Amino acid sequence: MTILQEVARRRTFAIISHPDAGKTTLTEKLLLFAGAIQIAGSVKARKASRHASSDWMEIEKQRGISVASSVMQMEYRDCVINLLDTPGHQDFSEDTYRVLTAVDAALMVIDAANGVEPQTIRLLQVCRARNTPIITFINKMDREVREPLELLSEIESHLGMDAVPFSWPVGMGKSFGGVFDIRRDRMRLFRPGQERRNDDDEFIDGLSNPQIAERFGQAFEQASGEIELINEAAPAFDHAAFLAGKQTPVFFGSAINNFGVQEVLDALVDLAPQPGARQALEREVKPEEPKFTGVVFKVQANMDPAHRDRVAFVRVSSGRFERGMRLKVARTNKEMRPNNVVSFLSQRRELLDEAYAGDVIGIPNHGVLQLGDVLTEGESLRFTGLPFFAPELFQAVEVKDPLRTKQLRVGLTQLGEEGAIQVFRPEVAGGSLLLGAVGQLQFEVVAHRLKTEYGVEARMLPSRYTMARWITSENPKALRKFMDANAAHIAYDVVDAAAFLIGSSAQLRVAEELYPEVKFHAMREHGGKVFGDTL
């Protein structure tokens, strides 16, 4: 196949949702239906030996939440699907944001009982800012849930886009009878069962078929009235509007019962776009170009604790990747020849010989690659859009056993480069390392990982700081003067970018007034010392 044909087969998407909407379950079931796994690990059965394929880190298995993004590749209907499962917990929104820069579409999972929740809205704003097409799956229809028309209205008002139902529920909760496929004019009957595939599903054709009315009575009467209303009032599906992020196709189902999953998988193949062009600072990079380019959007330490390794997750932007090819790291101008490159089914790795635009490949390395790095066959390119946000919570960290100080620094350096936490080193000698986070759970996860992956018992101590701003100035003397005058508040992050740490916004306002030549930034690009203040 040509590069163009290979690119046309690719679909790369992320699954996003509020915590507990059933995202990890749906991820499992998509893998099951595509034939990538034989048995889905129930996320609820955490104490059993079976765990969700996409929740592989020890703390995820214990707590039943996704805290690191997982990457999985599978083939379905002659398409290569790259599925990125993201953390649902709000404390990990930065990691989710980084994943959303690497995909061409998003699958939004909504809990039918709760509707559109705050975390979903934040993630959707990121998708909207990038014009990422969104497919919506309304989950848990076999529970007591809200009215479907109400849910549609909520999606439209919160997301600012038209919701176009492709299927519609007949009943809900205990009286959930199935979903009616509006486009194919047939009803798929619901039968509970977690290990069931769709091979033996029962269908009844035709909205006006008396058989359906006979079997489902009042529930179908209500559903058919709603479907008629939708056919008259809702806009028709427009593929161009979907690709522009102005329409979202909506599906209903119950992921835990494998119901409605097939339709979503088919929609991903039929509707989601193939990889598109990506804008670098220097030029537009097209996926069908013969030369390889790729961007590191995630670094994960200790995917294999036995080897203490770090894997850089690279989204291929153009060309064809071949194992052993010579690549240039644009940030350092250094050359590398990765030989043991892998593709993923969560933590299960397979050696990879080639990859094309849209694919996500893993390059094991020992700190050579950082978040935001661009890999090319020689060209100097810079991609932006992979930010660190200024943390809002701070804790000092100390090691209980002074003999483990080196391991603490190694662990925090790796976790900081991975983006799991922000690590600040005080300018004043002898000060404790400071950790910065956007949510409290990040500290717990880091303490747990330091213990299990690096053998370090760390103490987290309260900090007087509540705010950080990276500092720059076009006048080096003005910057030095500011740093000398505020030495006790200056610290350096993992790329040695200087930051000003303070306890209140009032302190920031005073500093801005006293030092007009110094700029205070709420955001830093992962690619290095590139700063900004907004998304």
From Swiss-Prot:
* GO CC terms: cytosol
User: What GO biological process term is on the record, naming one?
Assistant: regulation of translational termination
All copies of the tr-type G domain together span 8-276
Cross-referenced PROSITE patterns, in alphabetical order?
Answer: G_TR_1 (PS00301), G_TR_2 (PS51722)
- Residues noted as binding GTP in the record, renumbered to the chain: 17-24, 85-89, 139-142
Subcellular locations according to the entry: Cytoplasm
One matching Pfam family? EF-G_D2
Q: Which key words tag this protein in UniProt?
A: Cytoplasm, GTP-binding, Nucleotide-binding, Protein biosynthesis
Xref: InterPro entries:
EF-G-like_DII, EFG_III/V, G_TR_CS, P-loop_NTPase, PrfC, RF3_C, RF3_dom_3_sf, RF3_GTP-bd
- Decide whether keyword GTP-binding is in the record: yes
Molecular-function GO term, any one: GTPase activity
Q: Which SUPFAM superfamilies match?
A: EF-G C-terminal domain-like, P-loop containing nucleoside triphosphate hydrolases, Translation proteins
**Function description:** Increases the formation of ribosomal termination complexes and stimulates activities of RF-1 and RF-2. It binds guanine nucleotides and has strong preference for UGA stop codons. It may interact directly with the ribosome. The stimulation of RF-1 and RF-2 is significantly reduced by GTP and GDP, but not by GMP.
What family does the database annotate? Belongs to the TRAFAC class translation factor GTPase superfamily. Classic translation factor GTPase family. PrfC subfamily.
Protein name, entry field: Peptide chain release factor 3
Biological source species: Bordetella avium (strain 197N)
Task: Give the taxonomic lineage as stored in the record.
Answer: Bacteria, Pseudomonadati, Pseudomonadota, Betaproteobacteria, Burkholderiales
What gene codes for this chain? prfC
